[in-house]
Design a protein with these regions (language model features):
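Short, intrinsically disordered/low-complexity patches at protein termini
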Residues: 90, 101-102, 110-112, 161
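Short, glycine-/small-residue-rich phosphate/pyrophosphate-handling segment
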Residues: 103-152, 156
């Protein structure tokens, strides 16, 4: 399992650290990437990952190993604060640079158009938005964004959870169960 932790501060990632601990104690192999500790660049929008060197970003800053870990994972958790209806800057940088994980071609998927897959298998996504208002405008926008990202990343399944900035023990346990056995926890 891969956890991409987009928390901006230590205070924000206590529930994420708790999730990693619970999964590890449950016997799961977990790679927890605290993105704020990495010096990752922004996507330059050059499309080199599509046309010059397919699947690889020209910027060599450690992002490639995150992409490999993402594709190797059975489950990838995207964790971070809901920021104006989007991801934190650290998590957005990583997701933007996942462009090389898909092809520059399009296909119809239901009633939408998406990029074709570059790889045969993709991880299940668990998207965790940290917010104290899971029913507000920002959360509704975040939900749409996360679901569209899941479609473009060809996730075979996506589970979206909102968690308070100071979650209860029960909420933390439910989050871990959602990652391990998603059918057991109602949305």
């Amino acid at each position: 399992m891969l956890i991409l932790d987009g928390s901006r501060t230590e205070a924000e990632d206590t529930a994420c650290l708790d999730l990693a601990r619970r999964l590890t104690e449950g016997g799961h192999q977990v790679q927890h990437e605290r993105l704020r500790d990495r010096k990752l660049g922004y996507c330059q929008g050059c499309f080199g990952c599509w046309v010059e060197h397919p699947g690889r970003c020209k910027t060599d800053d450690g992002h490639a190993e995150i992409g490999r870990a993402f594709m190797a994972a059975d489950v990838a958790v995207l964790y971070g604060p809901v920021t104006f209806g989007g991801y934190s800057a650290a998590l957005e940088k990583v997701l933007d640079r996942f462009l090389g994980l898909i092809m520059p071609f399009f296909q119809k998927y239901g009633d939408i158009t998406r990029h074709t897959a570059r790889h045969a298998r993709h991880p299940r996504l668990v998207v965790v938005g940290v917010t104290d208002d899971p029913h507000g405008t920002d959360a509704r926008t975040f939900r749409k964004l996360a679901m569209r990202n899941a479609v473009n990343l060809h996730a075979p399944r996506v589970d979206l959870r909102f968690i308070d900035r100071a979650p209860t023990e029960s909420a933390r346990a439910d989050l871990a169960r959602c990652v391990i056995e998603p059918e057991a926890v109602a949305a």
